[in-house]
Structures are given as C-alpha cells and as structure tokens.
C-alpha cells in the first residue's frame, strides 16, 4: 500500500503530460489553419497576420519540448551557419536595414528548428504515422474550406459571405490573395487526401468528393506550377509505387492526375455552361493555351538577374535585396516591371550571396533533398516528399518560401522524412536552450506586433499632417522593425528638404530596396531640389520604365514648386 501514492502520482503526471501535448498540438493546428485562411491582407505588410499566426503555431509546437531535450542530428549542424548569413551581411554593410537582416535570420532559424521538431516528433514509425495522419487530416479540412472559398469567388458571391476576400482578378485565390499560392496549398491538401485513402483512414465516399472539389479549385487558379507538378507526380508516383507497392491501384491514382489535365482543357466550356445556367456573371477564365503562351516576363527577369550576378559575383547584393540587384542592372532590363524576387530560388540565392556562397548553399540543398528522397520508402515519407516537392517546384518559378505558412510546414515535413533515414548520430539540445529560444521568440513576436501596429497608426497621422506621437506600451519609438522607423522619417521628410550627399546616399539604398512609384518620385524630387540633376533624371527613367509612368524633369520641377508653396 505504501507504493500506491507513487503509482497514482506517476499515472496522474503521465495523464497531465498527454493532455498538455494534445492541447499544444490542437493549438498549433488552429493557429496554422488560421494562417492559411486569414483574409487580412492590408498594406504595407500584406501577409502580416498570416506570418504572425504561423510563427505563433511554431512556438506552440516548440513548447512541447520545454521540459525535454531536442535530439539534434549532426548533419543538421551543417545548415546552422546559414541562419546567421543575413546578420553577418548587415554587419558588413551589405544588407541595408537591421530589421530586414533580423527577420531573414529569424525565418531561417524557424525553418531549421521546425525541421528538428518534425524529426523529434517522428522518431519511431508509430510516431511518424501518427504525426503525418494528423497533418493530412488538417490539410484535408483546410483545403476543403479553401476550395469552397475559391468557388464562392468564382461565382462572384464573395460579397455575401463574411470572411472571404473580394476577388480583384480573373483567377480565384481564396484567402491567399495569390492564385499560385492557393494552388500549391491545395496540392498539399490533395496529397493529404491521397494519404488518407492509401492508409484507409477515411471512407472513400468522404475522400473522393473532396478530392474532386480540390482538383476543381486548383483548375480555377489556372496555375501553371500545378501543371508542372502534375507531370512530376505522374513520373514520381509511377516509380515509387512500383518499387514499394501501395494499397491504391496505380492506374486509379494516375487517372486522377490525367483527369486534372482534362478538367483544365475543358474548363472554359464548363464556365460558359455555368454562366448560362446561373443567368449571371461568373469569373471568366483563360484557356490552357492562353495561359501557357502568357507570362514570359520570367525569362526577362532571369536574364537580368544573371547579368546582375556577373556584376557582383563574389559578395552578391545581400539577403532579400533582389530589388537592389534589379536597379543595379537596369542596362539589361527588358521588362517593364519592378520585382523583389528573381522568381527562382536558385537565382535568388546567387543574387543574395554571390556565386561561391550561393552556389554552395544550392548544392547542399540539392544533395539533402536527393538524400531524403533516396531513403523515402514508406507511405508517409513518399507522400511527404511529394508535398515538399510541390513547394520546391513552386520555388523554381516564384517565391512561396518567403511566406512562413509555407516555409515552416515544409521544414516540419523535411524533418519528418529525415527521421526515417538510418544511422543518424545525434546530440541533445539542452532544455535551457529550448526555453531561451522560446522566450526570445515570444518577446520578438510581441515586439514585432507592437512596432507594426505603431507604424500603421503613426503613418496615417503623418499623411493627415498630424504629429506621429501615438504610443504603444508607453513609447512611440519603433524598437525592432527599423525599416518602418525609416519609413516614418521618409514620410515626414519634405521632397524639397536640403540634404547632404551622405544623407542622399543613405536614402538611395532604401529607395533601391523598395523601388515603389512613391519612393522613386520623391527621391527624384529630393535630388532635383539638391541640384543633382543627372541622378534625378536617372530616377525618373527608373520610375517610367518599372511602373509604366510618363514623368519628365519639368513635372518634378512643378511638383517641387508646389511643395515649396505649400510649406510657406
């Protein structure tokens, strides 16, 4: 009898741990779901709400290890130095802004840590199946909601449904505000359906109608990235299902893939039919041929970025500073568009870091992905590889990994795949380190929320010619997001203010990194007011070419005269 209290306490403790684990996993699922479904896309940080929710989900998942150590595979240590590259570049003056470098390093660290979390939560085959099943259920549910939202937009009914974004183009995008991002996410949901069907976790009559709706919503997006992945899927699944037999018949799965292409070809006719039956307007869509023959701007972007790399082959232009590379290589610009990404992750890495470092990072990523794929032999790891491939294929054409709601889940999935690779030596990360990271993460997230909202309030006051003196938490000073602090100064600055050459050079770096029409025009006005006519003419040329404007030096002189008059 003397041992009974200890047995009871042990059982009670185990029950409490299980409940806490369940609650944290549930909270993580809710937060990342809200990140995917958030309709809040407001200027200047369009995905601010989704990014905050994604990192909150990450911290919720990290809380599972506040009382137990994380196992760190030694191979993972090779990737850790990459986390600090943006901050090192800022220290040497290559990255213009501190907060840009800090956030870049924070995103890289988040990606690295979610890989560790995926690895540690999937060490055994039972844990791996459990985690991937939960992930597939989550993707299944959110993809269903996203598909319904896309259909609502396609039918022009979004104004009648709360929580749904208004559609401003002919390609539905649900609440992602970007059709290709929606398409890639729906592919993840479709692969979740495949896993649930393969492992018989749900009845077929639940899965296939939802899968059909998801395929239809992907077609609505008219994403060419989805077509590329469809071809990749056919090849990959044919090979893997031949090597490792599956429950589902190979021909049945491949018929679904072929059906996706058939729906795309027939979709314009289907749209016209629905329009007749509905006796109203539905969103007009392009045909497959029209979509395939459009959007060749990427070729011009890639060519210009190669020229930019040749200009700075060793150091690059700094992490997340593709815009500076574009303005530095305007002599080879063939497209009239301002871009902040090379629309290809390999080119972005080379632009940011130069041939040597960027090439080394690219080669390591390629080797790592191939290594994971070679060891993908179970249903969980094979379908996880397909999910990761969907996002990585997207990165070759756009920039999905700049969004935390893709970056962090991809890290988690890659950690899950890595957990089933054999003979990995690992060391333990002390609990104290995990707790420190968690506390710093909470504090950083809170400060970012504060700084961003402080900027939004005070920037509106500046535009209304009111003093920017609103305080949050007892201060009106921006602490972490220094880029927004510079923007407040920039908004307050008169376009005819007398400045030194050093001050103008500092502003030039900021403008090159954010070459919006407002920034280019105002900087040109400043140069003109400070008698730097050639540079002013150059900024006008950038403005006209990148944003399809038609300004002249005389227009700026008139604008400056008006600014002088209004300041009297």
UniProtKB/Swiss-Prot annotation:
InterPro entries tied to this protein: O-antigen_ligase-rel_domated, PglL_A, WaaL-like, Wzy_C_2
Membrane protein topology class: Multi-pass membrane protein
Top-level EC class: transferase
Enzyme Commission no: 2.4.-.-
Chief location bin: membrane
Transmembrane regions: 17-37, 46-66, 78-98, 101-121, 132-152, 176-196, 214-234, 251-271, 349-369, 376-396, 397-417, 429-449
GO molecular function: glycosyltransferase activity
Superkingdom assignment: Bacteria
Reported phenotype of the disruption mutant: Cells lacking this gene lose the ability to glycosylate substrate proteins and their glycoproteome is highly affected.
Keyword Glycosyltransferase set for record: yes
GO biological process terms, semicolon-separated: protein glycosylation
Any Gene Ontology CC annotation: plasma membrane
Function: Catalyzes the O-glycosylation of multiple protein targets. Is responsible for general protein glycosylation within A.baylyi ADP1. Does not act as an O-antigen ligase.
Family note: Belongs to the PglL O-oligosaccharyltransferase family.
Protein known as: General O-oligosaccharyltransferase
Designated gene of the protein: pglL1
């Amino acid at each position: 009898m003397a041992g009974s209290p200890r047995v009871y306490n042990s059982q009670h403790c185990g029950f409490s741990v299980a409940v806490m684990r369940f609650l944290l996993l549930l909270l993580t699922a809710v937060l990342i779901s809200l990140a995917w479904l958030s309709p809040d896309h407001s200027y200047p940080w369009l995905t601010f709400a989704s990014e905050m929710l994604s990192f909150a989900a990450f911290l919720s998942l990290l809380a599972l290890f506040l009382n137990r150590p994380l196992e760190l595979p030694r191979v993972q240590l090779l990737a850790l130095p990459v986390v600090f590259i943006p901050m090192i570049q800022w220290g040497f003056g290559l990255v213009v802004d501190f907060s840009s470098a800090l956030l870049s390093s924070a995103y890289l660290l988040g990606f690295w840590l979610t890989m560790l979390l995926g690895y540690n939560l999937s060490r055994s085959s039972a844990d791996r199946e459990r985690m991937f099943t939960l992930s597939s259920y989550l993707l299944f549910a959110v993809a269903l909601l996203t598909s319904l939202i896309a259909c609502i937009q396609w039918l022009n009914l979004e104004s009648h449904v709360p929580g749904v974004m208004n559609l401003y183009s002919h390609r539905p995008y649900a609440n992602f505000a970007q059709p290709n991002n929606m398409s890639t996410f729906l592919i993840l949901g479709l692969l979740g359906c495949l896993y649930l069907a393969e492992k018989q976790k749900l009845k077929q009559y639940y899965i296939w109608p939802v899968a059909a709706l998801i395929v239809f919503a992907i077609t609505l997006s008219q994403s060419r990235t989805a077509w590329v992945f469809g071809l990749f899927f056919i090849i990959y699944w044919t090979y893997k299902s031949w090597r490792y037999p599956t429950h589902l018949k190979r021909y049945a799965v491949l018929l679904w893939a072929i059906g996706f292409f058939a729906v795309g070809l027939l979709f314009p006719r289907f749209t016209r039919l629905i329009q007749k039956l509905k006796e109203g307007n539905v969103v007009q869509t392009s045909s497959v041929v029209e979509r395939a023959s459009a959007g060749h701007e990427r070729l011009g972007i890639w060519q210009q970025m190669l020229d930019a790399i040749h200009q700075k082959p060793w150091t690059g232009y700094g992490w997340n500073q593709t815009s500076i590379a574009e303005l530095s290589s305007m002599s080879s610009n063939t497209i009239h568009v301002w871009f902040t990404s090379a629309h290809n992750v390999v080119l972005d890495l080379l632009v940011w870091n130069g041939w040597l470092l960027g090439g080394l990072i690219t080669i390591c990523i390629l080797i790592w992905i191939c290594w994971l794929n070679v060891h993908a032999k179970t249903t969980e790891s094979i379908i996880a590889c397909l999910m990761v491939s969907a996002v990585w294929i997207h990165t070759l054409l756009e920039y999905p990994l700049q969004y935390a709601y893709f970056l962090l889940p991809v890290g988690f999935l890659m950690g899950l795949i890595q957990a089933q690779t054999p003979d990995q030596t690992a060391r333990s990360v002390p609990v104290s380190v995990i707790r420190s990271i968690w506390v710093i993460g909470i504090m950083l997230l809170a400060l970012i929320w504060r700084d961003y909202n402080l900027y939004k309030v005070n920037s509106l006051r500046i535009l209304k010619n009111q003093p920017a003196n609103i305080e949050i938490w007892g201060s009106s000073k921006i602490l972490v997001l220094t880029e927004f602090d510079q923007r407040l100064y920039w908004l307050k600055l008169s376009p005819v203010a007398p400045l030194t050459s050093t001050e103008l050079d500092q502003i030039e770096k900021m403008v090159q990194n954010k070459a919006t029409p407002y920034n280019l025009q105002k900087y040109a006005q400043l140069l003109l007011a400070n008698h730097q006519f050639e540079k002013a003419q150059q900024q006008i040329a950038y403005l006209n070419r990148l944003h399809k404007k038609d300004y002249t030096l005389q227009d700026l002189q008139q604008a400056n005269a008006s600014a002088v008059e209004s300041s009297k």
